[in-house]
């Protein structure tokens, strides 16, 4: 099995990249793909850049050039579920856009024409992630993760997300675009991120302070998940 891993920012990929053996780097379309072995398992790690377009472009390049069997999206996220704290893990069972609106033509809020309203994560990947969470004794929540091209740092944006997606557990800027591409390529995916901030008016301060904590936790989870998928 070859496992694809996608993170948006340098801080979100550096810990994993440094552990890849026999590493080779491909720079393409503003993205970087690192291939090699992570604890003996073939991986292709992508640093995509921030936002939905960068994530979709990167995911497509990774699938075409890295040929992974599954995709894990890692990194940081803003917490929406009330129980989440900085460093906790979120696992997607579904991903949706929070900034897409074609409701004038009868679509659900967040749904794009020709697409499902949400993109379902793979059940086996979810189960493997939850097994890793239990083994590592981490605090985690599974549920809907929503994405959009905005860092949520104020009451208006937060209220809109809570109104349209009251069940959402976390918000970030890439996961749904990656899920969308995986859906089109029929490649299983799961989002496994760590909380860097609680989405509120002070979230930008929390993000700057705790990004390193989130990156460490998400990298720990992904490394464990890669082992679980490769060896059971």
UniProtKB/Swiss-Prot annotation:
Q: Where is the active site?
A: 12 (proton acceptor), 197 (proton donor)
Task: Recite the UniProt keywords alphabetically.
Answer: Amino-acid biosynthesis, Hydrolase, Methionine biosynthesis
The UniProt record lists the EC number as 3.2.2.9
Q: Does the keyword Amino-acid biosynthesis apply?
A: yes
Q: Which InterPro entries match?
A: MTA_SAH_Nsdase (IPR010049), Nucleoside_phosphorylase_d (IPR000845), Nucleoside_phosphorylase_sf (IPR035994)
One GO biological process this protein is involved in is: L-methionine salvage from S-adenosylmethionine
Q: Name one GO cellular component term.
A: cytosol
Question: Catalyses which reaction?
Answer: S-adenosyl-L-homocysteine + H2O = S-(5-deoxy-D-ribos-5-yl)-L-homocysteine + adenine; S-methyl-5'-thioadenosine + H2O = 5-(methylsulfanyl)-D-ribose + adenine; 5'-deoxyadenosine + H2O = 5-deoxy-D-ribose + adenine
Q: Where does substrate bind?
A: 78, 152, 173-174
Q: Which GO terms describe its molecular function?
A: adenosylhomocysteine nucleosidase activity; methylthioadenosine nucleosidase activity
- Entry superkingdom: Bacteria
Pathway named in the protein's UniProt entry: Amino-acid biosynthesis; L-methionine biosynthesis via salvage pathway; S-methyl-5-thio-alpha-D-ribose 1-phosphate from S-methyl-5'-thioadenosine (hydrolase route): step 1/2
Q: Which Pfam families match?
A: PNP_UDP_1
User: What do we know about how this protein assembles, alone or with others?
Assistant: Homodimer.
Task: Return the HAMAP family for the record.
Answer: Salvage_MtnN
> Family, per the entry?
Belongs to the PNP/UDP phosphorylase family. MtnN subfamily.
Q: What does this protein do?
A: Catalyzes the irreversible cleavage of the glycosidic bond in both 5'-methylthioadenosine (MTA) and S-adenosylhomocysteine (SAH/AdoHcy) to adenine and the corresponding thioribose, 5'-methylthioribose and S-ribosylhomocysteine, respectively. Also cleaves 5'-deoxyadenosine, a toxic by-product of radical S-adenosylmethionine (SAM) enzymes, into 5-deoxyribose and adenine. Thus, is required for in vivo function of the radical SAM enzymes biotin synthase and lipoic acid synthase, that are inhibited by 5'-deoxyadenosine accumulation.
Recorded hits in PANTHER family, A to Z, give: 5'-METHYLTHIOADENOSINE/S-ADENOSYLHOMOCYSTEINE NUCLEOSIDASE, 5'-METHYLTHIOADENOSINE_S-ADENOSYLHOMOCYSTEINE NUCLEOSIDASE
Q: What is this protein's record name?
A: 5'-methylthioadenosine/S-adenosylhomocysteine nucleosidase
Organism, per UniProt? Shigella boydii serotype 4 (strain Sb227)
What does UniProt list as this organism's lineage?
A: Bacteria, Pseudomonadati, Pseudomonadota, Gammaproteobacteria, Enterobacterales
């Amino acid at each position: 099995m070859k496992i694809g891993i996608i993170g948006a920012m340098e801080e979100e990929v550096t810990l994993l990249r440094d552990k890849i053996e026999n590493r080779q780097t491909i720079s393409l379309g503003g993205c970087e793909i690192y291939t090699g072995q992570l604890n003996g398992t073939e991986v292709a790690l992508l640093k995509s850049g921030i936002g939905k377009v960068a994530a979709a472009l990167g995911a497509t390049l990774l699938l075409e050039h890295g040929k992974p069997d599954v995709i894990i999206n890692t990194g940081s996220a803003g917490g929406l579920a009330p129980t989440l704290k900085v460093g906790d893990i979120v696992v997607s069972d579904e991903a949706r856009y929070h900034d897409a609106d074609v409701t004038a033509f009868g679509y659900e809020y967040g749904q794009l024409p020709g697409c499902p309203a949400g993109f379902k994560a793979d059940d086996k990947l979810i189960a493997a992630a939850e097994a890793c969470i239990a083994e590592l004794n981490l605090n985690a929540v599974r549920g809907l993760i929503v994405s959009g091209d905005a860092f949520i740092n104020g009451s208006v944006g937060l209220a809109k997300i809570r109104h349209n997606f009251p069940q959402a557990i976390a918000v970030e800027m890439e996961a749904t675009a990656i899920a969308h591409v995986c859906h089109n390529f029929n490649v299983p995916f799961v989002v496994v991120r760590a909380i860097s901030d609680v989405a509120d008016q002070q979230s930008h301060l929390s993000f700057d302070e705790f990004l390193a904590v989130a990156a460490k936790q998400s990298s720990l989870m992904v490394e464990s998940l890669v082992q679980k998928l490769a060896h059971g």
